[in-house]
């Protein structure tokens, strides 16, 4: 007798089978360290998934600096991979192969902005080098997590308790409809049930940048800003309790040319109120194809004004 649970179980089995066909294992060989026996190669392992005709997306840290990249599909077929793009700043890379097994289709990309905490997700990949895609189930534990360093900026990460192990990096995180909502990127060693995935919308933005510029780029307008908190508002005697306080403007940048100055307060971006500096960074990246970002600026003694600030781009690794 059919029950809602059995129906859901059958649906999950169908989704997982369809998704797994487009997931690959990626093995790499990189130059290693020097020894008395010569250079010792370093072998690496990761996952990836098909997003276009003979195009696979994975993490940049999986394939960066690799001398040899092998791509293995679910049926065991193996192809030489060529790294097309490796955006180490966002940890996204594209790898091409000459051919794919018959009948394999690119995975469908969802909308990670619609993810909700508690939503069921599946991580698909090749943990520990085990043959064939492995599937684990969990939920979205949190969204908006950040891992930021000097050469990397992983923002708005999806946190999940779906089991993630070494080798899962680059594999898809999919929802119950089989839509890719993220790409697995990191785990915290010794922490049970804490893994992270790059939102698929971030991957989409990288693809748009590559289509427009031929390479990954970093978007900016040339300001340093701080989120206004009650403490910041009190310390600087600010007239507003919400927004982004401009603390520095880089000379020669679009913001400088738009006459934005330290002490100004960004109150809205594209007509929406703003309170977190991460919203500015994201809005600038989201507007890269548009070429400008529209800001509402408040300056004490002068009131509010709206300004369209052009976006400048610089190449990233």
Stretches with model-predicted labels:
Residues 100-106, 246-250, 276-277:
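Short, structured beta-strand/loop micro-motifs enriched in basic residues and often containing a Trp
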Residues 64, 256, 268-296:
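PDZ domains, with a preference for the canonical peptide-binding region formed by the helix
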Residues 50, 56-57, 254-277:
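Conserved PDZ fold ligand-binding element
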Residues 169-170, 229-237, 250-268:
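PDZ/PDZ-like domain micro-motif
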Residues 1-231, 241-242, 285, 301-304, ...:
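Serine-dependent protease modules
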Residues 223, 249, 263, 273-277, ...:
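PDZ peptide-recognition modules
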């Amino acid at each position: 007798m059919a029950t809602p649970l059995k129906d859901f179980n059958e649906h999950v089995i169908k989704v997982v089978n369809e998704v797994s066909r487009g997931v690959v294992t990626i093995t790499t060989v990189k130059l290693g360290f020097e020894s008395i026996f010569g250079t010792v190669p370093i072998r690496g392992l990761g996952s990836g998934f098909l997003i276009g005709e003979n195009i696979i997306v994975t993490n940049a840290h999986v394939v960066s600096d690799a001398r040899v990249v092998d791509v293995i599909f679910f049926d065991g077929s193996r192809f030489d991979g060529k790294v097309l793009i490796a955006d180490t700043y966002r940890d996204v890379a594209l790898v091409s192969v000459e051919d794919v097994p018959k009948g394999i289709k690119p995975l469908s990309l969802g909308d990670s902005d619609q993810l909700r905490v508690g939503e069921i997700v599946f991580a698909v990949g090749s943990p520990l080098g085990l043959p064939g895609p492995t599937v684990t189930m969990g939920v979205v534990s949190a969204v908006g997590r950040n891992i930021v360093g000097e050469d990397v900026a992983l923002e708005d990460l999806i946190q999940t308790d779906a089991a993630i192990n070494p080798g899962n990096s680059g594999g898809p995180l999919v929802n119950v409809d089989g839509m890719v909502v993220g790409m697995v990127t990191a785990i915290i060693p010794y922490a049970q049930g804490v893994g992270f995935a790059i939102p698929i919308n971030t991957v989409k933005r990288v693809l748009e940048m590559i289509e427009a510029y031929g390479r990954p780029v970093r978007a900016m307008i040339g300001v340093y800003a701080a989120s206004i908190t009650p403490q910041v508002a009190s310390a600087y005697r600010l007239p507003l309790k919400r927004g982004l306080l401009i603390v520095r403007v880089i000379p020669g940048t679009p913001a400088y040319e738009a006459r934005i100055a330290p002490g100004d307060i960004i109150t809205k971006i594209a007509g929406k109120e703003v309170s977190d500096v991460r919203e500015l960074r994201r809005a600038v990246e989201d507007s890269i194809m548009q070429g400008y970002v529209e800001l509402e600026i408040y300056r004490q003694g002068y009131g509010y004004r709206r300004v369209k600030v052009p976006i400048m781009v610089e190449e990233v690794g």
